[in-house]
């Protein structure tokens, strides 16, 4: 009897030890996000709330920095979704917000605790369902030091700046911090792309940091335009893309696919996300059958 009890105790201890080892192995990285916003009317729109909630599912805290002012009553919307928020016109676009959010994390001790940081902005409706599968997939890419959702080859291969993730060895490097803190006001908005988005990837790559995108860019080579966001239905339906660029519903982004089919697919995928989008876009983009659903809501 004593031997059996001793054996049972040994098995229990071994099981607990194994469980603890597995738990340590799969421990979620501590992650903080900087979200860059812009509110010309001084309000927080529903799609932004959705985005912040999505980030909170994969991050331990979100810093919200807007390049605009905010009506005092609107700040209530941010209090339970952020660890810090700033709303001031700094005139450095999203990159100025990234800079300010990054430095707040640094000055308040969060970077010391962080394994990863996210830079994201409000140029997309996201997530369509959840960011979790994307982060689970990219966690397997142990070779990467930083990554983006999608890359572009215009000018040079680079991750697009509306969603980027950096591991500790990158964001703690003086080269990265120098680049971020060198962000300045530009006389034309296109310069934020050519000076910062286009240059960051090769700049970090030059120091030996490895990168890639969640969307398999080489596999997408059959889509002719280097801006793959011009094929939103393909990305969402075939590749599980969690983002829809807001510019799709303007004249500033060339689209090669049917937006009616896109909206119908989003409605089937996640009706609540569809309604977020429908409340923001011009009425004439919405197919008649979906207008009825919107009006009946």
Stretches with model-predicted labels:
Residues 15-17:
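Bacterial N-terminal signal peptides
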Residues 1-2:
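Short, low-complexity, Lys/Arg-enriched N-terminal segments of secretory-pathway carbohydrate enzymes
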């Amino acid at each position: 009897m004593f031997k059996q009890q001793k054996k049972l105790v040994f098995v229990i201890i071994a099981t607990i030890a194994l469980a603890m080892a597995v738990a340590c192995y799969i421990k979620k990285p501590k992650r903080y996000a900087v979200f860059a916003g812009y509110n010309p009317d001084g309000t927080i729109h529903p799609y932004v709330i959705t985005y912040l909630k999505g980030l909170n599912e994969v991050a331990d805290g979100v810093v919200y920095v807007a390049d605009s002012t905010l009506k005092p009553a609107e700040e209530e919307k941010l209090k339970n979704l952020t660890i810090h928020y700033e709303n001031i016109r700094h005139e450095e676009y999203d990159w100025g917000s990234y800079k300010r959010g990054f430095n707040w994390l640094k000055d308040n001790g969060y970077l010391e605790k962080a394994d990863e940081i996210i830079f994201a902005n409000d140029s997309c409706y996201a997530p369509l369902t959840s960011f979790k599968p994307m982060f689970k997939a990219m966690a397997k890419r142990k070779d990467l030091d930083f990554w983006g959702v999608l890359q572009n080859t215009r000018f040079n291969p680079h991750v697009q700046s509306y969603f980027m993730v950096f591991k500790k060895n990158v964001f703690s490097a003086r080269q990265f911090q120098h680049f971020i803190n060198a962000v300045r006001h530009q006389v034309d908005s296109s310069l934020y792309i050519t000076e910062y988005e286009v240059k960051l990837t090769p700049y970090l790559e030059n120091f030996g940091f490895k990168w890639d995108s969640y969307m398999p860019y080489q596999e997408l080579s059959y889509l002719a335009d280097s801006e793959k966001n011009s094929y939103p239905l393909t990305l969402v339906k075939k590749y599980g893309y969690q983002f829809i660029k807001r510019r799709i519903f303007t004249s500033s982004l060339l689209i090669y696919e049917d937006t009616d089919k896109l909206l119908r697919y989003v409605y089937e995928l996640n009706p609540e996300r569809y309604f977020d989008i429908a409340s923001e876009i011009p009425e004439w983009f919405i197919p008649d059958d979906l207008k009825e659903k919107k009006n009946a809501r």
